[in-house]
UniProtKB/Swiss-Prot annotation:
The keyword Membrane applies. It is a peripheral membrane protein. Signal peptide: none annotated. The lineage of its organism: Bacteria, Pseudomonadati, Pseudomonadota, Alphaproteobacteria, Rickettsiales. It is found in: Cell inner membrane. Transmembrane segments: none annotated. One of its GO terms (biological process) is proton motive force-driven plasma membrane ATP synthesis. It comes from Ehrlichia canis (strain Jake). This is ATP synthase gamma chain. The gene is atpG. CDD domains: F1-ATPase_gamma. F-type ATPases have 2 components, CF(1) - the catalytic core - and CF(0) - the membrane proton channel. CF(1) has five subunits: alpha(3), beta(3), gamma(1), delta(1), epsilon(1). CF(0) has three main subunits: a, b and c. It comes from the Bacteria. Produces ATP from ADP in the presence of a proton gradient across the membrane. The gamma chain is believed to be important in regulating ATPase activity and the flow of protons through the CF(0) complex. Pfam families: ATP-synt.
Length: 281
């Protein structure tokens, strides 16, 4: 009887977990859809900035966006604040460590800026001397304005670095996300194939492009952030879907075990009743 009660408690516990994982799966799916919409809008915005930059002298644009040496490198690492998303954070940490090894083999000075706590927690003990800052609570970033404020709150001056690279999990589809690197500084503008319009700039186009360049770099970083967020939600959705399947299998096994135990208990009770009846006769 005690065994049956224990099995019932386990079944109740697994059912509770199953409800939680189902809700988390639905929430992750909804968040993924919202992030995909933001990602599409951000890419359109980036294309418009590219068109403006593309309309001016390429050599001058190159002077604004490029530096001659790449000795001092800043790696901006995108991860998450929460777990329950499969190997999402492990992949970016492994990718980052390999990237750091390659840079240090070329005698580069490497500094780290983290978006999200998970990668920071996993790398702190090994790279504490290279970490400039960590920006937790990335889920509070709801639009580009909040993202800019988030970046400025880091206190890191990107212009002090010869090379700035953002490392993130790129979202290709719901079945494919993988670690990628996007160079921010120096930045090569992807020229649009659309027809170029002629512009007149006040005071000078170099002043205008210098201002636009910061917006372009922030947009590149924002897109990387959205790609990473989409990958996180997708990974969590898949992880919760897998957890749902596992809980379903476990419930089937527990139900079978419970029925067998209950049947054995009933059989034992019947044997005792029959034995008692026969002893009376």
């Amino acid at each position: 009887m005690a065994n049956l009660k224990a099995l019932l408690l386990r079944i109740k516990s697994v059912k509770s977990i199953q409800k939680t994982t189902k809700v988390m799966q639905m929430i992750s799916a909804a968040k993924l859809h919202r992030v995909q919409q933001k990602l599409e809008n951000a890419r359109k915005h980036l294309l418009e900035i590219s068109n403006v930059i593309d309309s001016v002298d390429k050599d001058n644009v190159s002077d604004v966006f490029s530096k001659h040496k790449k000795e001092k490198v800043l790696l901006v690492i995108m991860s998450s604040d929460r777990g329950l998303c499969g190997n999402f954070n492990n992949l970016i940490v492994k990718f980052t460590k390999s990237y750091i090894e390659d840079l240090e083999s070329d005698n580069k000075e490497v500094n780290l800026l983290f978006f999200g706590k998970k990668a920071y927690d996993m790398m702190y003990s090994q790279y504490s001397d290279k970490i400039l800052n960590v920006l937790p609570d990335v889920k509070s970033i709801t639009n580009f304005l909040y993202f800019k404020l988030f970046v400025y709150s880091s206190g890191v001056n990107f212009e002090k670095f010869d090379n700035v690279i953002v490392l993130f999990n790129k979202f290709y589809s719901t079945i494919l996300q993988k670690p990628s690197a996007q160079e921010l500084i120096p930045c090569n503008v992807e020229m649009s194939v659309l027809l170029k319009e002629m512009y007149q700039y006040e005071p000078t186009y170099i002043d205008v492009i210098s201002t636009i360049s910061l917006g372009y770099i922030l947009n590149l970083m924002y897109i990387a952030f959205l790609e990473n967020s989409a990958s996180e939600h997708c990974s969590r959705m898949i992880a919760m879907e897998s957890a749902n399947r596992n809980t379903k299998d476990m419930l089937n096994k527990l139900a079978l075990e419970y029925n067998r135990s209950r049947q054995a208990s009933i059989t034992t009770d019947l044997i005792e009743i029959i034995s008692g009846f026969e002893s009376l006769n």
